[in-house]
Regions:
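Membrane-embedded alpha-helical bundles of multi-pass transporters/translocases
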Residues: 1-537
Length: 537
């Protein structure tokens, strides 16, 4: 990746950017993990978290869809601004910000007024008390609609200007706000925090902390954006700027496409409302998976998006195909070890992360099978995103949108078929099935559009890594079982050692097996890790 130019004035390598993003995202994810541990210890899988899981669906959907790094706002702005000077970028950013803010302000009012209808549609199976709490929480978090759009614009604008540290780090402010809110409540009421008389207050604090966190995240970005000369907080309605229409051409279909994908989450939660504590279990399990997934997706998708955008002409397709392969193989090399760990070591992972306070053994047993299902789908989730970014780079947001439309109906059908026989894990497996189908469709279309892809070569490499993943999972399970038989797992110290040993076995076996395949992408990863450690030592 040496010598790859990310902007006109920057000379950072692709791997260098990935390193910056990875470190910043890791810090954010650590704070996110602490946030989830605080919530789990305070409320377990009870009504507060269950209501919050449903109330957060729409604000969270908007924050991920519009405000997320790698989201459509981010992708559209990077693809357009990366080709322009700062003097051209500011008016584009200000115009897009004005339009987005006006639309999302109306969305905020709509959410507040009709919160009860949204909750009833999302979760018809909720009991009266949980429903009431979810409605209140949604009304509190509704202004996150506007903040989500502003955060997404800030992500894309700063990345296009070769600023990666702050955008990747800023989500930690949201986590800190929730930690402070729940922590203060726990300090005031003590062990009674999960008692019935404090349930409503707990829901209010959780939702309020989330809103304050989103506001804090945006304020952290906007200063850097203004300082860099990338647009000020002013109203601008100049739609004649060429770059504005170019951004909208990518942003609108990309937003619709990503929105269709997140409708699958709505569908999952609709069925989850009929399964006791399913929403809370999915929340806790998904966060464990999203921690490494978020770090690796930012490492892979953030630096690759500008590269894809510069290789869209036919004369550059040979290199574009190489970059697509790199994206997919790096995805496999980073995701599959976690798949082995989350399937083979699901119970030790959940026990170490969550099992304390109100989160007891019964709660762990509910979350474990859900974590295994999420772990199985990690590669397909991120691999689909890699291929979608290729379409965005080609200026085609329509194809992902059409595929997402088909997937809505497929996901609903799979949810209906799987939720009764498999319970909560069945809902997760339905989404995994949708992602597998999406990857297949995108691969076939790109194969035709780019004049053929070396699918046989790619497939053999991925098949080899799959076999290695299975073997490393079996080895890590054996190590965990052996440790518990010999030393036990009666305290957190022994549990940490057990999980650390078994995880090391999984990663070690995976690396040994992957080395036999002689993949250049593995050499790249290893060289980057060595460089990082050598710099620190």
């Amino acid at each position: 990746f040496r010598g790859v130019i990310i902007t006109k004035k920057a000379t950072r390598s692709l791997a260098g950017i990935a390193g910056i993003v990875a470190v910043a995202t890791l810090i954010s994810k650590v704070f996110g993990l602490v946030r989830e541990q605080v919530i789990a210890a305070a409320y377990g899988v009870g009504p507060v978290v269950n209501a919050y899981a449903f109330a957060y669906v729409i604000p969270g959907f908007l924050l991920i869809l519009l405000g997320g790094i790698n989201g459509p706002f981010h992708s559209a702005l990077v693809s357009v601004l990366a080709k322009r000077d700062k003097s051209e970028s500011a008016p584009i950013v200000e115009t897009i910000t004005t339009l987005v803010s006006a639309i999302l302000l109306a969305v905020t009012v709509f959410l507040i007024v009709f919160a009860n209808i949204f909750i009833d549609v999302l979760a018809p199976g909720l009991d009266a008390a949980t429903r009431s709490m979810a409605i209140q929480q949604l009304q509190i978090m509704a202004p996150m609609a506007v903040l989500a759009g502003l955060i997404g614009i800030g992500f894309g604008t700063l990345n296009a200007a070769d600023q990666y540290w702050l955008p990747s780090l800023s989500p930690l402010f949201s986590s800190v706000a929730v930690i402070i809110g729940v922590g203060l409540l726990a300090w005031f009421v003590g062990d009674r925090i999960d008692e019935p008389q404090y349930v409503q207050l707990g829901g209010f604090v959780l939702a309020g902390g989330t809103l304050v966190g989103a506001l804090w995240q945006w304020l952290a970005q906007v200063g850097a954006q203004v300082k860099a000369g990338l647009g000020k907080l002013i109203f601008r309605w100049d739609w004649r700027i060429p770059g504005v229409s170019e951004v909208l051409r990518v942003m609108i279909p990309a937003t619709l496409s990503s929105g269709m994908l997140h409708i699958n989450v709505y569908t999952d939660l609709f069925f989850a409302s009929f399964i006791e504590n399913a929403a809370a279990s999915m929340r806790y399990a998904s966060f464990i998976v999203l921690t490494p997934l978020g770090i690796m997706s930012n490492m892979i998708l953030v630096p690759f998006m500008p590269i894809f955008s510069r290789l869209t002409e036919p004369e550059n397709w040979v290199e574009l195909k190489q970059r697509i392969r790199q994206g997919l193989l790096l995805t496999a090399l980073t995701m599959l070890p976690f798949t082995a760990i989350f399937i083979a070591l699901a119970f030790p992972v959940v026990r170490v992360i969550y099992q304390r306070g109100a989160f007891n053994l019964a709660a762990s047993e509910q979350v474990v099978p859900v974590l295994m299902a999420y772990g199985f789908g990690m590669f397909f989730y991120l691999g689909r995103d890699v291929l979608v970014r290729v379409f965005y780079a080609l200026g085609d947001g329509e194809t992902p949108f059409k595929v997402s439309m088909v997937n809505i109906f497929l996901n609903g059908a799979l949810d209906f078929l799987l939720y009764k026989p498999f319970g909560t894990p069945g809902l997760v497996l339905a989404t995994v099935g949708v992602n597998i189908l999406s990857m297949g469709i995108f691969t076939v279309i790109l194969n035709r559009r780019l004049g053929g892809l070396p699918l046989g070569e790619w497939g053999l490499s991925l098949l080899g890594l799959t076999v290695i993943t299975m073997l490393s999972g079996v080895g890590s399970w054996g190590a965990s079982w052996g440790w518990e038989k010999v030393f036990g797992a009666g305290n957190i110290f022994l549990q940490l050692l057990q999980l650390g040993l078994a995880s090391t076995v999984a990663v070690g076996l995976f690396l040994l097996g992957a080395m036999l395949l002689k993949l250049p992408e593995l050499d790249l990863l290893i060289s980057r890790v060595r460089q990082k450690f050598l710099k620190k030592s």
